[in-house]
Amino acid sequence: MSRFFSSNYEYDVASSSSEEDLLSSSEEDLLSSSSSESELDQESDDSFFNESESESEADVDSDDSDAKPYGPDWFKKSEFRKQGGGSNKFLKSSNYDSSDEESDEEDGKKVVKSAKEKLLDEMQDVYNKISQAENSDDWLTISNEFDLISRLLVRAQQQNWGTPNIFIKVVAQVEDAVNNTQQADLKNKAVARAYNTTKQRVKKVSRENEDSMAKFRNDPESFDKEPTADLDISANGFTISSSQGNDQAVQEDFFTRLQTIIDSRGKKTVNQQSLISTLEELLTVAEKPYEFIMAYLTLIPSRFDASANLSYQPIDQWKSSFNDISKLLSILDQTIDTYQVNEFADPIDFIEDEPKEDSDGVKRILGSIFSFVERLDDEFMKSLLNIDPHSSDYLIRLRDEQSIYNLILRTQLYFEATLKDEHDLERALTRPFVKRLDHIYYKSENLIKIMETAAWNIIPAQYKSKFTSKDQLDSADYVDNLIDGLSTILSKQNNIAVQKRAILYNIYYTALNKDFQTAKDMLLTSQVQTNINQFDSSLQILFNRVVVQLGLSAFKLCLIEECHQILNDLLSSSHLREILGQQSLHRISLNSSNNASADERARQCLPYHQHINLDLIDVVFLTCSLLIEIPRMTAFYSGIKVKRIPYSPKSIRRSLEHYDKLSFQGPPETLRDYVLFAAKSMQKGNWRDSVKYLREIKSWALLPNMETVLNSLTERVQVESLKTYFFSFKRFYSSFSVAKLAELFDLPENKVVEVLQSVIAELEIPAKLNDEKTIFVVEKGDEITKLEEAMVKLNKEYKIAKERLNPPSNRR
C-alpha cells in the first residue's frame, strides 16, 4: 500500500533513491543551480537537493544522491521548499545567489523595468522617429513627437528626475532640422503650420536649456558618457543642476506647467476639468502679481471652454468665472502702476519673460479683459433663455444682472485709467458702452438710477470717468444725460451697425420715459430705418421694438391716429412674436436650419423680462382701430363719402364682420371680445357701455399712468360716439339739439358744437348750425331712409323670384 495511506509508515531517506528516475532530464535542467557548498563533481542532476543548509543531508550516501525529494512540499522547486535545501529567492537572504535571476533572463523571461527606464525608452523612441521624419521632411510627425517629448519632460520633472540627456539631444536634433529647412520650400499649408509651430517651440526650449545645449554642442560624443550625479536623486541619463535656487526652479516649473496647459487648450482629447484643477493649483503656489495675472488670463477662458458644448454655463461654474474675473480686476487695481492688461500691448514670445517697462515704468500685458466680461454676460443671457420664465429660478437668476453691470462699469473705468491714447481708448470703450446701454435702455428711469448707484458704490475711489461722472449721480437729469451721452459717443463710431444700435437705444428710452414727439423726431432725423433689413437679426428686432414702443408712447398721450399709423404696418404681420424677438429659444431651435449656430439662435430672442406684453399691444391697436374705424364705417353705410384708410387683418372692422356672421354670440371672454363689445355699443351711441367694456380689460394695468390714459380714453370715446350717433340718425331727424346732445354724451355744449362743425366741414354733410348755435339743421339730401332702403331691396328680390318662377316662353 502506498506510504501516503499507511498509518504507521515512517519515511526513510534511503527509500527515495529508487524514485529519482521519475524526474525528467528537461525539468532538471530548468531547476539546475549550483550550491555554494557543493564540491562534488558528478554528472547526475542531484543539484536539485544540494543546498547547504542542513547537516543531515551530509550523511546521505552517494548512492542516495539520486533520491527523490520528500516531505509535504516535495513537488515544489528547491527554491520554494522549506526542507528541500533551497531558500526562497523572493526573500533575499544572505546566501541568495543572483545567478538564478540572470539565468531566467537568459532563458527569455520578461524583465521588469522601472518607471525611469521606461521614460528613457520612450524618449529614445521619439528620437528615432524624429530622425526618420527628418529624411522625408515630415514636419507633422516632428511637431507631434516634439510635443510628446515635452510632455515626457514634464513627467520627469514632476518626479524630480531632472532633464534627461536624450531630451537635450532631441532638442538639438530638431533645432538643426529647423535651421536646415527653408519655409519657402514647404508648399503644403499644414506642413508649413507644423514647421512654424515647431520652430517657435524649439526656440523656447533651447533658450531654457542654454547651458546643456552648449555642453552638447561642444562635445556630443562625451555628453552621454558624463556622470550625472549632481544630486543623490539623479539617475543614469538624468542631470539636475544643484546650483539653481529653489525659487527659480519653482518659477520655471510654474510657467512650464502653465505653458503646457496653454498648448493643450483646444485639443479634443484634453480633459478641461483637469486643466481647470491644475490652474487652480497653480494659483495656490503663485507668488508674484505677474504669475497671478497670467494664471487668471488662462483660467477664465478655460472655464468657458469647459461648457462650450452646453446650452449655457452651469450657474456654479458661472459664479466661479465671475469670481475669477473680479479677483483679476482686484489684482490689476492694486498693481495699476506696475502691470496693465489691454488689447493693444505687444505680444511676448515666452510667458515666463515679463514684458519690458515702458516710459512710465508700466509692464503692459496682452489680454482682453472685456472679452471675459462679454462672455460672462452672454452665458448669463443664455441661462435666462433656458430657464422657465414663470418659475422662481428665473427671478433668482435675474438678481445676477447687477453683478454683471458692476463688472461692465468697472472694466470701463479701468480702460479710462490705463489707456492714454485717445484713439485706442475710443476703440476699447465701444463694447462697454454698448453693453451698458443693452442692460438699461428698456428700464424705467428709477430702475436705472438704482442700478447706477449700486454699481458706483463698489468702484474704488481712485477711478473717475470723464464720460459718465459719478458726481452727477444725485442730479435729476443723470439718467437722461447718461443715455444721451453714451449714445452720442457711439453714434460717432465708424461702425454703422453700432451707430444705428446706439440711436435705437436712445429712441427706445426716450419713448418709454420721456415724450413721444421727441422720440419721433429722433427717429425721423436719424433715418435709422434706411436699409435696416440688411443688418443682422438682433438689430432688426431692436428696430421693431422701438416702433412698438413709439406707438405705445403715442397711445399714452391719447394720440390715437399716430399710434394707429405706427402700429398698423407692424401688426399686419402674422409673426409679431418672432419679429419682436419674443419667441422661445426652444421654438427657434426647432424651426431654424441645421447650419444656424447656438449663438445665432440666441440673438433671435430676448429674455422674458425684456418682452413687451403682446396683449397690451393688441389691446392698444384694437382700441385705436375702434376709435378711428367705427365712425367711418357708420358714415360709409349712411351714404356719406369717406376716405378709405388701410386696415390690417387685426383691425376692428374684420372682427365685427366675423362677429356678425356668428350664429351664437356669447358674453365677452377674451381681450378682443371686450373691445368688440365696446365697438357694438359705440355703434348704438351708447358710450357708457363702451367705456365700461374697455375699462374691464386688465392689460391697462401694465401702463405706468393707467388712470390718466383711461380718463383721456373716456373723453375720446364720448367724442367718437357723438360722431357715430350723428352719422346714424341724421337721416331720421331734421334737426339736432345741442343741449340734448351735450346731455346725452356728457360733453360741454361748446365741445359738441366744435366736433359736429368739424365733421360737417370735413365730410361735406348738408347740415348747418343756426344763428343761436343751439340747433343743427339737417337738409335732406340724396340719401334714402332705412324704410326706403328696405323697400328697394324687397322689390329687387321680388323681381328675381318672379323671373325664376315664370320664365319667358321663348327661353328654354
Swiss-Prot record:
Residues 608-783 form the PCI domain. It holds the Pfam family eIF-3c_N. Keywords: Cytoplasm, Initiation factor, Phosphoprotein, Protein biosynthesis. Residues 18-30, 38-64 have a biased composition (Acidic residues). The modification Phosphoserine is found at residues 98-99, 103. Residues 1-110 are annotated as: Disordered. Component of the eukaryotic translation initiation factor 3 (eIF-3) complex. Component of the eukaryotic translation initiation factor 3 (eIF-3) complex, which is involved in protein synthesis of a specialized repertoire of mRNAs and, together with other initiation factors, stimulates binding of mRNA and methionyl-tRNAi to the 40S ribosome. The eIF-3 complex specifically targets and initiates translation of a subset of mRNAs involved in cell proliferation. This is Eukaryotic translation initiation factor 3 subunit C. It comes from Saccharomyces cerevisiae (strain YJM789) (Baker's yeast).
